[in-house]
Protein backbone atom coordinates (compact mmCIF):
# COMPACT_ATOMS: atom_id res chain seq x y z
CA UNK A 1 0.00 0.00 0.00
CA UNK A 2 1.37 3.34 -0.96
CA UNK A 3 1.71 5.88 1.78
CA UNK A 4 1.07 9.48 0.93
CA UNK A 5 3.81 11.72 2.20
CA UNK A 6 3.32 15.43 2.83
CA UNK A 7 6.50 17.14 1.81
CA UNK A 8 7.79 20.54 2.87
CA UNK A 9 5.99 23.60 1.53
CA UNK A 10 7.41 24.75 -1.82
CA UNK A 11 9.02 27.85 -0.37
CA UNK A 12 10.79 28.62 -3.61
CA UNK A 13 7.51 28.79 -5.47
CA UNK A 14 5.87 30.83 -2.71
CA UNK A 15 8.75 33.30 -2.66
CA UNK A 16 8.63 33.52 -6.44
CA UNK A 17 4.93 34.33 -6.37
CA UNK A 18 5.51 36.87 -3.61
CA UNK A 19 8.21 38.59 -5.65
CA UNK A 20 5.91 38.70 -8.68
CA UNK A 21 3.09 40.13 -6.58
CA UNK A 22 5.35 42.80 -5.11
CA UNK A 23 6.70 43.65 -8.54
CA UNK A 24 3.17 43.98 -9.92
CA UNK A 25 2.16 46.17 -6.98
CA UNK A 26 5.22 48.36 -7.47
CA UNK A 27 4.48 48.67 -11.18
CA UNK A 28 0.89 49.62 -10.39
CA UNK A 29 2.09 52.23 -7.89
CA UNK A 30 4.48 53.74 -10.44
CA UNK A 31 1.76 53.75 -13.09
CA UNK A 32 -0.72 55.30 -10.66
CA UNK A 33 1.83 57.93 -9.63
CA UNK A 34 2.56 58.74 -13.26
CA UNK A 35 -1.17 59.05 -13.96
CA UNK A 36 -1.60 61.25 -10.91
CA UNK A 37 1.26 63.58 -11.76
CA UNK A 38 1.27 63.44 -15.54
CA UNK A 39 -1.10 64.78 -18.16
CA UNK A 40 -1.81 61.52 -19.98
CA UNK A 41 -4.17 60.00 -17.43
CA UNK A 42 -6.25 63.06 -16.64
CA UNK A 43 -9.99 62.60 -16.52
CA UNK A 44 -10.29 59.33 -18.43
CA UNK A 45 -7.85 60.70 -21.04
CA UNK A 46 -5.91 57.66 -22.24
CA UNK A 47 -4.68 58.33 -25.79
CA UNK A 48 -3.88 55.39 -28.06
CA UNK A 49 -2.52 57.13 -31.14
CA UNK A 50 -1.00 53.99 -32.75
CA UNK A 51 -4.40 52.31 -32.47
CA UNK A 52 -6.12 55.34 -33.97
CA UNK A 53 -3.64 55.49 -36.83
CA UNK A 54 -4.11 51.78 -37.54
CA UNK A 55 -7.91 52.02 -37.45
CA UNK A 56 -7.92 55.03 -39.77
CA UNK A 57 -5.65 53.22 -42.22
CA UNK A 58 -7.86 50.10 -42.20
CA UNK A 59 -11.32 51.61 -42.32
CA UNK A 60 -11.16 55.08 -43.86
CA UNK A 61 -10.83 54.75 -47.62
CA UNK A 62 -8.95 57.55 -49.35
CA UNK A 63 -8.54 60.84 -47.48
CA UNK A 64 -4.80 60.21 -47.08
CA UNK A 65 -3.98 63.88 -46.55
CA UNK A 66 -6.77 64.30 -44.01
CA UNK A 67 -5.69 61.19 -42.08
CA UNK A 68 -2.10 62.40 -41.99
CA UNK A 69 -3.17 65.84 -40.75
CA UNK A 70 -5.40 64.38 -38.03
CA UNK A 71 -2.67 62.10 -36.70
CA UNK A 72 0.04 64.76 -36.96
CA UNK A 73 -2.08 67.36 -35.15
CA UNK A 74 -3.05 64.92 -32.39
CA UNK A 75 0.51 63.70 -31.85
CA UNK A 76 1.85 67.23 -31.52
CA UNK A 77 -0.94 68.21 -29.15
CA UNK A 78 -0.97 65.10 -26.94
CA UNK A 79 2.80 64.98 -26.58
CA UNK A 80 2.97 68.64 -25.54
CA UNK A 81 2.73 68.76 -21.71
CA UNK A 82 1.76 72.44 -21.80
CA UNK A 83 0.02 73.34 -25.09
CA UNK A 84 -0.41 77.05 -25.72
CA UNK A 85 -3.87 76.62 -27.24
CA UNK A 86 -6.61 74.01 -27.37
CA UNK A 87 -6.64 71.69 -30.36
CA UNK A 88 -9.28 72.69 -32.89
CA UNK A 89 -10.14 70.24 -35.67
CA UNK A 90 -12.61 70.95 -38.44
CA UNK A 91 -13.94 67.98 -40.42
CA UNK A 92 -15.95 69.06 -43.42
CA UNK A 93 -17.05 67.80 -46.80
CA UNK A 94 -19.82 65.85 -48.49
CA UNK A 95 -22.01 63.27 -46.77
CA UNK A 96 -20.47 59.80 -46.72
CA UNK A 97 -16.76 60.65 -46.60
CA UNK A 98 -16.11 59.83 -42.95
CA UNK A 99 -16.34 63.01 -40.84
CA UNK A 100 -18.57 61.59 -38.12
CA UNK A 101 -16.78 58.25 -38.26
CA UNK A 102 -13.42 59.94 -37.70
CA UNK A 103 -14.79 62.01 -34.82
CA UNK A 104 -16.12 58.86 -33.13
CA UNK A 105 -12.72 57.20 -33.56
CA UNK A 106 -11.01 60.20 -32.00
CA UNK A 107 -13.21 59.92 -28.92
CA UNK A 108 -12.70 56.14 -28.81
CA UNK A 109 -8.91 56.31 -28.96
CA UNK A 110 -8.42 59.38 -26.76
CA UNK A 111 -10.75 58.51 -23.86
CA UNK A 112 -11.22 55.12 -22.24
CA UNK A 113 -14.98 55.66 -22.23
CA UNK A 114 -15.07 56.79 -25.86
CA UNK A 115 -18.21 58.74 -26.71
CA UNK A 116 -19.65 57.60 -23.39
CA UNK A 117 -16.90 59.25 -21.39
CA UNK A 118 -18.21 62.00 -19.09
CA UNK A 119 -15.48 64.20 -20.54
CA UNK A 120 -16.62 63.85 -24.16
CA UNK A 121 -19.43 66.29 -24.94
CA UNK A 122 -21.34 65.75 -28.19
CA UNK A 123 -23.67 68.52 -29.36
CA UNK A 124 -26.33 68.12 -32.04
CA UNK A 125 -28.30 71.12 -33.35
CA UNK A 126 -31.51 69.10 -33.54
CA UNK A 127 -31.21 67.76 -30.00
CA UNK A 128 -29.50 70.59 -28.13
CA UNK A 129 -30.23 73.73 -30.15
CA UNK A 130 -33.59 73.17 -31.88
CA UNK A 131 -35.10 76.68 -31.65
CA UNK A 132 -33.28 79.62 -33.31
CA UNK A 133 -35.44 82.02 -31.30
CA UNK A 134 -33.73 80.76 -28.12
CA UNK A 135 -30.21 81.56 -29.30
CA UNK A 136 -29.41 83.94 -26.44
CA UNK A 137 -30.48 81.32 -23.90
CA UNK A 138 -28.41 78.71 -25.71
CA UNK A 139 -25.39 81.02 -25.64
CA UNK A 140 -25.54 81.34 -21.87
CA UNK A 141 -26.08 77.60 -21.43
CA UNK A 142 -23.27 76.65 -23.80
CA UNK A 143 -20.80 79.05 -22.20
CA UNK A 144 -21.66 77.72 -18.74
CA UNK A 145 -21.48 74.11 -19.92
CA UNK A 146 -18.06 74.48 -21.54
CA UNK A 147 -16.66 76.57 -18.70
CA UNK A 148 -17.98 74.24 -16.01
CA UNK A 149 -16.67 71.09 -17.67
CA UNK A 150 -13.26 72.60 -18.38
CA UNK A 151 -13.06 73.65 -14.74
CA UNK A 152 -13.81 70.06 -13.74
CA UNK A 153 -11.42 68.59 -16.31
CA UNK A 154 -9.09 70.45 -18.64
CA UNK A 155 -8.77 67.32 -20.78
CA UNK A 156 -12.25 67.53 -22.26
CA UNK A 157 -13.44 66.98 -25.82
CA UNK A 158 -16.27 69.07 -27.29
CA UNK A 159 -17.80 67.74 -30.50
CA UNK A 160 -20.18 69.94 -32.49
CA UNK A 161 -22.07 68.09 -35.21
CA UNK A 162 -23.77 69.56 -38.31
CA UNK A 163 -22.40 73.06 -37.91
CA UNK A 164 -24.21 74.15 -41.06
CA UNK A 165 -27.55 73.64 -39.27
CA UNK A 166 -26.75 75.81 -36.27
CA UNK A 167 -28.49 79.20 -36.01
CA UNK A 168 -26.05 82.10 -36.49
CA UNK A 169 -24.36 83.59 -33.47
CA UNK A 170 -24.25 80.75 -30.96
CA UNK A 171 -20.65 79.76 -31.58
CA UNK A 172 -19.47 83.27 -30.77
CA UNK A 173 -19.39 82.30 -27.09
CA UNK A 174 -16.66 79.75 -27.89
CA UNK A 175 -14.24 82.25 -29.43
CA UNK A 176 -12.54 83.11 -26.12
CA UNK A 177 -11.93 79.38 -25.51
CA UNK A 178 -10.32 78.90 -28.93
CA UNK A 179 -7.78 81.71 -28.79
CA UNK A 180 -4.24 82.03 -27.41
CA UNK A 181 -5.12 83.29 -23.92
CA UNK A 182 -4.02 81.03 -21.07
CA UNK A 183 -7.10 81.48 -18.92
CA UNK A 184 -10.69 82.31 -19.84
CA UNK A 185 -13.28 83.16 -17.19
CA UNK A 186 -10.84 81.81 -14.61
CA UNK A 187 -10.57 78.46 -16.43
CA UNK A 188 -7.44 76.91 -17.95
CA UNK A 189 -8.65 75.47 -21.24
CA UNK A 190 -5.44 74.88 -23.20
CA UNK A 191 -5.67 71.06 -23.03
CA UNK A 192 -9.19 70.92 -24.44
CA UNK A 193 -10.08 69.55 -27.87
CA UNK A 194 -12.81 71.06 -30.03
CA UNK A 195 -14.10 69.24 -33.11
CA UNK A 196 -16.42 70.96 -35.59
CA UNK A 197 -18.20 68.86 -38.21
CA UNK A 198 -19.60 69.98 -41.54
CA UNK A 199 -18.73 73.62 -41.34
CA UNK A 200 -17.41 74.86 -44.68
CA UNK A 201 -15.51 77.94 -43.50
CA UNK A 202 -13.44 75.88 -41.11
CA UNK A 203 -10.13 76.37 -39.43
CA UNK A 204 -7.73 73.49 -38.84
CA UNK A 205 -5.00 73.42 -36.15
CA UNK A 206 -4.38 74.98 -32.72
CA UNK A 207 -6.85 77.79 -32.41
CA UNK A 208 -9.59 79.09 -34.66
CA UNK A 209 -13.06 80.56 -34.62
CA UNK A 210 -16.52 79.32 -35.35
CA UNK A 211 -19.95 80.81 -35.97
CA UNK A 212 -23.60 79.88 -35.86
CA UNK A 213 -25.53 77.50 -33.46
CA UNK A 214 -28.05 76.94 -30.60
CA UNK A 215 -29.62 74.42 -27.73
CA UNK A 216 -29.90 72.69 -24.19
CA UNK A 217 -26.97 70.67 -23.03
CA UNK A 218 -26.23 67.24 -21.54
CA UNK A 219 -24.09 65.29 -24.04
CA UNK A 220 -25.65 62.32 -25.91
CA UNK A 221 -23.21 59.86 -27.57
CA UNK A 222 -23.69 59.28 -31.30
CA UNK A 223 -21.80 58.71 -34.55
CA UNK A 224 -22.43 58.17 -38.26
CA UNK A 225 -20.47 58.87 -41.45
CA UNK A 226 -19.60 61.77 -43.82
CA UNK A 227 -16.78 63.18 -46.04
CA UNK A 228 -13.56 64.46 -44.59
CA UNK A 229 -11.47 67.41 -45.70
CA UNK A 230 -8.71 69.24 -43.90
CA UNK A 231 -7.79 72.85 -44.33
UniProtKB/Swiss-Prot annotation:
Q: Which residue numbers fall in the propeptide? A: 28-189
Q: In which tissues is it expressed?
A: Isoform 2 is ubiquitously expressed.
Places the protein is found? Secreted
Q: Keyword Signal: yes or no?
A: yes
Which one of the record's GO molecular function terms can you name?
ATP binding
Q: Which residues form a coiled coil?
A: none
Sites binding ATP sit at 93-100
Glycosylation positions in this chain: 149
Classification via SUPFAM superfamilies: P-loop containing nucleoside triphosphate hydrolases (SSF52540)
Gene Ontology cellular component annotations, sorted alphabetically: endoplasmic reticulum lumen; extracellular region; nuclear envelope
Q: Does the keyword tRNA-binding apply?
A: no
Q: Which UniProt keywords apply?
A: ATP-binding, Glycoprotein, Hormone, Nucleotide-binding, Secreted, Signal
GO biological process: what's one of them? Answer: positive regulation of gene expression
Question: What Pfam families does the record tag this protein with?
Answer: Torsin
Write the signal peptide boundaries: 1-27
Q: Which family does it belong to?
A: Belongs to the ClpA/ClpB family. Torsin subfamily.
Q: What does this protein do?
A: Salusin may be a endocrine and/or paracrine factor able to increase intracellular calcium concentrations and induce cell mitogenesis. Salusin may also be a potent hypotensive peptide.
Protein known as = Prosalusin
User: What organism does this protein naturally occur in?
Assistant: Rattus norvegicus
Amino acid sequence: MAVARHGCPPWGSILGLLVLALAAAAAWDVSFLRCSLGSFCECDFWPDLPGLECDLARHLAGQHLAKALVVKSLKAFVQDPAPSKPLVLSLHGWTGTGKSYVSSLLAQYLFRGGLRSPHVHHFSPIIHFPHPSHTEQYKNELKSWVQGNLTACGRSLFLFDEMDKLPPGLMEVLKPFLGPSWVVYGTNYRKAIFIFIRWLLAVWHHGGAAAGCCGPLPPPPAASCAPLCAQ
